[in-house]
Swiss-Prot record:
Induction: By ethanol, heat and salt via sigma B-dependent promoter. This is Probable oligo-1,6-glucosidase 2. The keyword Acetylation does not apply. SUPFAM superfamilies: (Trans)glycosidases (SSF51445), Glycosyl hydrolase domain (SSF51011). InterPro entries: Glyco_hydro_13_cat_dom, Glyco_hydro_b, Glycoside_hydrolase_SF, O16G_dom_2, SusG-like_C. Disulfide bonds: none annotated. Transmembrane segments: none annotated. Its main location: cytoplasm. It comes from Bacillus subtilis (strain 168). It holds the Pfam family SusG_C.
Length: 561
């Protein structure tokens, strides 16, 4: 029988390449993950989401797949995977796999046949179009800053790639493609995998006629209208549910980009029979200049963050379900981004956790977030591996003439590699990640910020996360209650109330490095309040309280007294 077990779960995301190496080759692997399962269990997580482990040329580090039914050699064997799955289940945990269905690697056997023969059945598995007198079919740019059309000399046509040149988009209009994808999904679910996170789901339905990029930048057309939420996206999703998910008691989550809450409800509404929940990125785009790329920085306005998160809480309150996250493999470290990774690293990391993880939804904790890992201080482009970062640097510096120092400032703030530096386990060689040479440099602050140090510090970010997760489970019914934002216009405080018929939870958070004054809400019974969680030592409970830099307090109010 299908259940909503995922509503009470806490998910821990692993980027396997950077989590734990077991054989000294500098690359994390499945046996390394097995060796750290007890750590994840002790944290309090219930589900492990593992990024792609399929064979890949690693142009985009696993998101360019050549075989969806195998394990990449550097990660281990299928036997290793079976042992991982068994060990996960023995600990009462669940395993969710990342599944890439918008595109394949150009090294995939389907594409290798398609590029050589226009008459191959695999030709229609991808988007092929003739060029124009000016070159490509359109002048659009991909997510990685290069043209979306790549010329292929064997047949004299262009193929579509919404991401890197080596990631060719699959043609979901072709029912054979869809059935082949469903077969691959069932392959893993039949092994006992507990769910799938679907990568770039919003891109699978595309429009045939693509307007000019020049029209877009001149504000004459919608931004990239052929990319997200095409007209058949929900038809495809209903088919995925009918063909695959409806036959298993598993979790389904899709990455859908920059959708609105109204659009999000179409994906995850309980009456839609599509997905359990979605990853949207509205709240993660608030520190970029409107209409520009995420490299184009601007300060975060707290009022904007409160507004966006509240809209999602309210819109999905009775229909659908939210994902609660700050970090993943594509985002920089949140304590460096929205907090203070210097003097107030611990305080701000804890405050950020209290802000997001007491909301309604399923928490997603990304590896290293729970110990307050920070962005890396790499100032040379040679130290980066991420194709998105490298492409942007070369385009802006060498093609557009940007100041290299300005470009590097953007990279230091936003590169995906900040999330991908090796997990910091201890203060020993390579942070305990590997005995060999790590595939990506370790953040040099590992001597101070690491799991071993955090485990021995009662006041650590790690121990705070453990308490927070425990409280979510202790008050599981309250975590399904209503959400109401308080003080929406306060420039420093992020305050909200969770409530059910018996209890209230008041989360008060100073989102700044300056002191902030909090007035106890008149409609909240202070006499019935007790402090559940805080990131400073305090025991005062007054009508007016001064909150220190990045201070967070979470109160429980009993409505029955």
């Amino acid at each position: 029988m299908k259940t909503d077990w995922w509503k009470d779960a806490v998910v821990y995301q692993i980027y396997p390449r950077s989590f734990q190496d077991s054989n000294g080759d500098g690359i994390g692997d499945l046996r390394g993950i097995i060796s750290r399962l007890d750590y994840i269990k002790e944290l309090g997580a219930d589900v492990i989401w593992i990024c792609p482990i399929y064979p890949s040329p690693n142009v985009d580090y696993g998101y360019d797949v050549t075989n969806h039914k195998a394990i990449m050699d550097s990660y281990g064997t299928m036997d290793d995977f079976h042992e991982l799955l068994d060990q996960v289940h023995q600990r009462g945990l669940k395993l969710v796999m990342d599944f890439v269905l918008n595109h394949t690697s150009v090294e995939h056997p389907w594409f290798k046949e398609a590029e050589l023969d226009k008459n191959s059945k695999y030709r229609s598995y991808y988007y092929w179009r003739p060029g124009t007198k000016n070159g490509p079919p359109t002048d659009w740019l991909s997510n990685y800053g290069c043209p979306v059309w790549q010329y292929e000399e064997h047949t004299g046509e262009y193929y579509l790639h919404m991401n890197a040149v080596k990631q060719a988009d699959l043609n979901w209009e072709n029912p054979e493609v869809r059935q082949a994808v469903y077969d691959m999904m069932k392959f893993w679910l039949d092994k006992g995998v507990d769910g799938l996170r679907i990568d770039q789901l919003h891109l699978i339905s595309k429009k045939e006629y693509l307007p000019s990029y020049e029209d877009y930048i001149n504000q004459q057309a919608e931004p990239k209208p052929f990319q997200p939420n095409g007209e058949r996206i929900h038809d495809y999703l209903k088919e995925i549910t009918d063909e695959v998910f409806s036959h298993y008691d598993v979790m389904s989550v899709g990455e859908v980009g920059s959708v609105t809450p109204e659009e999000g409800l179409k994906y995850t509404g309980t009456d839609k029979h599509e997905l359990n929940m979605i990853f949207h990125f509205q709240h993660m785009e608030l520190d970029q200049q409107p209409g520009k790329e995420h490299w184009d920085l601007k300060p975060l306005e707290l009022s904007d963050l409160k507004s966006v998160l509240t809209k999602w809480q309210k819109k999905l309150e009775h229909q659908g379900w939210n994902t609660l996250f700050w970090c993943n493999h594509d985002q920089p470290r949140i304590v460096s981004r929205f907090g203070d990774d210097g003097e107030y690293r611990k305080a701000s990391a804890k405050m950020l956790a209290a802000v997001i993880y007491f909301m309604k939804g399923t928490p997603y904790i990304y590896q290293g977030e729970e110990i307050g890992m920070t962005n890396a201080p790499f100032t040379r482009i040679e130290d980066y591996k991420d194709i998105q970062t490298i492409n942007m640097y070369h385009k802006r510096v060498f093609e557009k003439g940007y100041d290299p120092n300005d470009v590097m400032r953007s990279i230091l703030a936003k590169s995906r590699d900040h999330a991908r530096t090796p997990m910091q386990w201890n203060s020993g060689k390579n942070a305990g990640f590997t005995d060999g040479t790590p595939w990506l440099k370790v953040n040099p602050n590992f001597t101070a910020i690491n799991v071993e140090e955090a485990q021995g510090d009662p006041d650590s970010v790690l121990n705070y996360y453990k308490k927070l997760i425990s409280l979510r489970k202790q008050y599981a019914d309250l975590m399904k209650g209503s959400f109401d934002l308080l003080l929406p216009d306060d420039p420093q405080l992020f305050v909200y109330m969770r409530e059910n018929s018996k209890q209230q939870l008041l989360s008060v958070n100073n989102f700044s490095k300056e002191q902030a004054v909090f007035q106890w809400p008149k409609n909240c019974g202070k006499a019935q309040a007790s402090l559940l969680l805080s990131n400073y030592n305090n025991d005062d409970l007054d009508d007016e309280m001064v909150f220190r830099p990045y201070e967070s307090r979470v109160y429980l109010l009993d409505k029955t007294n």
